[in-house]
């Protein structure tokens, strides 16, 4: 972190007496720049191209040095469109990596990868900036305390609980509800949590970013009257941005979160939607830089790039960063190198299933595929652990019996198996839940269910006390009392129809 008394723009200190180079080659978002002998910039230095295009329009493009090619040439990746750039244009070496504004001034604002505000609310105080490239905290600084992070979402809290200060991944293919789940978590946690949040929109839809911004203003997470009272900073590098911006926007968001953790000593929530797009952008840049592709066409440096981002997302003795990351799974294949590399860094994985989404069970979290390092009796307690294991066993048995049911019908099952199937179907439906952020689509009000209520509900189903209730009574309700009330209403309705 550094204090800049004067800056001519976010992350670009006064540019007089800097190294000057000239553009030698432009290949899409990649520039080759020639510098005078002995004046070569360092890797990751920010370069700025200023000038006018053929029509006289002002050009201001920031690039990041990626390779030193020899013969006084460097190869840099542009952070914005390279339209209008020409060979021979002057390039200024800023002498430092990209730096972005950090601290209280960032709250309630939307930034791009360079730390420039894009919300038309005027300039941001850039006296305190921080470079986006830094090393991860040392071993000795890390905090190893274990505690649960309650989300109010039944399936998550019971079967794959989140760790406070941990890393959580939401895995799913296209259109199974990753963004809705991450927005619900922002709604539930950011409101109840009281600390600050940073949202990094990496290569996702601009419309979703806009929806999120509007929703945060409505819910008060962003305070329009007094912007400094806001609880969140947003950083967006969406699908339409060049690969350089999408590759670095995650680091910009992380740098803002690190400042709150290290300097303000706060507990921070970092939401990243979508970490796969970070890998995808790295793959595009890698190809543009001429590196030989690795497995499935990904960059050979996939593990290194992922590690350099993920290792900085951690809890120290000063404060914590709890990170929730959406991970797109290409073609629903969890063995694809991108999701497989991400798995290694996570404390909890919430896997979304297309099969459950097709049944209309939302959130479509797979109770058998989702995992958490926190689901241990010494951390969550015996009662929680036992209930979770019995729910998983019942669901697993139902999964095994599905082939028999499909071929022979449920009448061929033993009495015990029939009871297991009936309870598993109730459990499957009770794992669904109406979301606050989906109220506009579903028409039913959202529900926050505490952990104790969740455990009680599943214990009642497993004990057989609710065997007489119809399974549709458990669909899209909050706690178990709502399910019994819904069953009574269904009973009354069926009697009236008769």
Curated annotation (Swiss-Prot):
The lineage of its organism: Eukaryota, Viridiplantae, Streptophyta, Embryophyta, Tracheophyta. Its main location: plastid. It catalyses: ATP + H2O + 4 H(+)(in) = ADP + phosphate + 5 H(+)(out). This is ATP synthase subunit beta, chloroplastic. One of its GO terms (molecular function) is ATP binding. Produces ATP from ADP in the presence of a proton gradient across the membrane. The catalytic sites are hosted primarily by the beta subunits. It comes from Drimys granadensis. ATP binds at residues 172-179. Belongs to the ATPase alpha/beta chains family. Keywords: ATP synthesis, ATP-binding, CF(1), Chloroplast, Hydrogen ion transport, Ion transport, Membrane, Nucleotide-binding, Plastid, Thylakoid, Translocase, Transport. GO terms for biological process: proton motive force-driven mitochondrial ATP synthesis. InterPro entries: AAA+_ATPase, ATP-synt_VA_C, ATP_synth_F1_bsu, ATPase_a/bsu_AS, ATPase_alpha/beta_chains, ATPase_F1/V1/A1_a/bsu_N, ATPase_F1/V1/A1_a/bsu_N_sf, ATPase_F1/V1/A1_a/bsu_nucl-bd. It is a peripheral membrane protein. GO terms for cellular component: chloroplast thylakoid membrane; mitochondrion; proton-transporting ATP synthase complex. It is found in: Plastid, Chloroplast thylakoid membrane. F-type ATPases have 2 components, CF(1) - the catalytic core - and CF(0) - the membrane proton channel. CF(1) has five subunits: alpha(3), beta(3), gamma(1), delta(1), epsilon(1). CF(0) has four main subunits: a(1), b(1), b'(1) and c(9-12). NCBIfam families: atpD (TIGR01039).
């Amino acid at each position: 972190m550094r204090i800049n008394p004067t800056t001519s723009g976010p992350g670009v200190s006064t540019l007089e007496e800097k190294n000057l180079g000239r553009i030698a080659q432009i290949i899409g978002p990649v520039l080759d720049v020639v510098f005078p002998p002995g004046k070569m910039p360092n890797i990751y230095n920010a370069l700025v191209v200023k000038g006018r295009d053929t029509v006289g329009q002002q050009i201001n493009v920031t690039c990041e040095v990626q390779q030193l090619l020899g013969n006084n040439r460097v190869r840099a990746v542009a952070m914005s469109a390279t339209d209008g750039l020409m060979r021979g244009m002057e390039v200024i070496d800023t002498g430092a990596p990209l730096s972005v504004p950090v601290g209280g001034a960032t709250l309630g604002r939307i930034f791009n990868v360079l730390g420039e505000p894009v919300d038309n609310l005027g300039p941001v105080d850039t006296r305190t900036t921080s470079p986006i490239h830094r090393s991860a905290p040392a071993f000795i600084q890390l905090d190893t305390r274990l505690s649960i992070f309650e989300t109010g979402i039944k399936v998550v809290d019971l079967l794959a609980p989140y760790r406070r200060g941990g890393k959580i991944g939401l895995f799913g293919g296209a259109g199974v509800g990753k963004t809705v789940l991450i927005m619900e978590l922002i709604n539930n946690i950011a409101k109840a949590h009281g600390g600050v949040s940073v949202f990094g929109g990496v290569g996702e839809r601009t419309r979703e970013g806009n929806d999120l911004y509007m929703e945060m203003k409505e819910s008060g997470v962003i305070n329009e009257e007094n912007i400094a009272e806001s609880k969140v900073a947003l950083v967006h590098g969406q699908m339409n941005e060049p690969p350089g911006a999408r590759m670095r926007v995650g680091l910009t968001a992380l740098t803002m979160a690190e400042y709150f953790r290290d300097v303000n000593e706060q507990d921070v929530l970092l939401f990243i939607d979508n970490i796969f797009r970070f890998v995808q952008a790295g793959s595009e840049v890698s190809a543009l830089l001429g590196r030989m592709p690795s497995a499935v066409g990904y960059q050979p440096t996939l593990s290194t790039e992922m590690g350099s981002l993920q290792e900085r997302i951690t809890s120290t003795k000063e404060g914590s960063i709890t990170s929730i990351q959406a991970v797109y799974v290409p073609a629903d294949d969890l063995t694809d190198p991108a999701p497989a590399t991400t798995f290694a860094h996570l404390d909890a994985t919430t896997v979304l299933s297309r099969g459950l989404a097709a049944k209309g069970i939302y959130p479509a979290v797979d109770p058998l595929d989702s995992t958490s390092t926190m689901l241990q009796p010494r951390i969550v307690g015996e009662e929680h652990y036992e209930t979770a294991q019995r729910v998983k066993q019942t669901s697993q048995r139902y999964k095994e019996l599905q082939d028999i049911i499909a071929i022979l019908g449920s009448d061929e099952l033993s009495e015990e198996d029939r009871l297991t199937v009936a309870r598993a179907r109730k459990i499957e439906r009770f794992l669904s839940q109406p979301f606050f952020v989906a109220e506009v689509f579903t028409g039913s009000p959202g529900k926050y269910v505490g952990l104790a209520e969740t455990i009680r509900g599943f214990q009642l189903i497993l004990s057989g006390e609710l065997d007489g209730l119809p399974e549709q009574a458990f669909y899209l309700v909050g706690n178990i009392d709502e399910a019994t009330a819904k069953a009574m209403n269904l009973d009354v309705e069926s009697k009236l129809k008769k």
